[in-house]
From Swiss-Prot:
This is NAC domain-containing protein 6. Involved in response to abiotic stresses and promotes cell death and hypersensitive-like responses. May act downstream of NRP-A and NRP-B in the endoplasmic reticulum (ER) stress and osmotic stress response that mediates cell death. One of its GO terms (molecular function) is DNA binding. It comes from Glycine max. Keywords: DNA-binding, Nucleus, Stress response, Transcription, Transcription regulation. Residues 178-204 are annotated as: Disordered. The lineage of its organism: Eukaryota, Viridiplantae, Streptophyta, Embryophyta, Tracheophyta.
Amino acid sequence: MATMEDMNNMSGEITLPGFRFHPTEEELLDFYLKNMVVGKKLRYDVIGFLNIYQHDPWDLPGLAKVGEREWYFFVPRDKKHGSGGRPNRTTEKGFWKATGSDRKIVTLSDPKRIIGLRKTLVFYQGRAPRGCKTDWVMNEYRLPDNCKLPKEIVLCKIYRKATSLKVLEQRAALEEEREMKQMVGSPASPSSTDTMSFSSPQEEQNMPLPLLQHVLKKESETEDMVVPKQEKITNQLVLKDTNKSTCGTSLQMPFGKEKLPDLQLPMLSDWTQDTFWAQLNSPWLQNFTPTNILNFY
């Protein structure tokens, strides 16, 4: 059991400025995991024991003992019932999916000596087999199959994969394209003239009587609204033309004489007003009869 002095030393070591925890894969397997499996207590408890599948990956950094960009946990292997002993890696909002086959980890001093296996998994939001891939990655380290030590505990390293600028640009382009499709696909708000209903005779026959009466009433109201509007526009155009003609002339009528009297012209049937016929209608010619002619001679 660790003494109070050991705990103080451990706390002081971890909180020292500049302290970073970046173990190699060989150190994780041959030192931390192996000592945890055999039950050997370490002086510095830098890796905590946690069932990470009860939490989503974005919650794990706050549950780790140390780490800034990488977080480490001892995790119990939870077997899924009736599936050949495959571990259950499902969380509340997603699941961890393995990518590729396991990779063998060897020591630097003896490349032929296998000290463990590494499995890489990626977190997907949703439910299997469908889901949305995220940038959360996990490296699961376990002891080799030929090891006689218990294998109910694994060591997991959680981190976020660095996203390149090209991938970010592709995501932004896809998001923009999806928004444009939604804008094009969404129906535009109809105007007042677009809402006018014109039903075919066949549709009117198939339409119930109350509904048909309602539609005809709506069409009649729409026509009554449109006709006065057209008459108003016509009157405005006539008034505008009148104003233009008035403003275009330079003649001004005297005050009180805005309206000229009508020009008096002789009627078409009044031939006495013509100068030629007035000469023929002289009094002398009126007395010019056959009797007067004989008396004249």
